[in-house]
Amino acid sequence: MDKTVKTFKKNKFQEIRVGIREYKGNDLIDIRTWTMTQGTEAMVPTSKGVSMNIHLITELKEALGEVERILKESLML
């Protein structure tokens, strides 16, 4: 299954895409920077990102929750 779940702007020419994709028979969570190709408005994936097995979703959510907690405690959010 290849499905983009969320897309948000990183800057004027790049966006972050979060989704699920299949690679070599493995289902992966993919968080990746996509960039606009020069001279067009087509977006292409870059090597900047991370793919991980879908079974790591719980650990990923826990880590992001901890990051959010620390940022709030530090008054950064």
Regions found by a protein language model. Give the residues of each.
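Mixed-charge, Lys/Arg-enriched low-complexity segments
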Residues: 50-77
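A generic short-segment signal for beta-strand/edge and adjacent turn/coil regions
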Residues: 1-2, 17-22, 76
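A short, structured beta-strand/loop element
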Residues: 16-48
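Negatively charged, low-complexity tracts enriched in Asp/Glu with abundant Ser/Thr
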Residues: 1-12
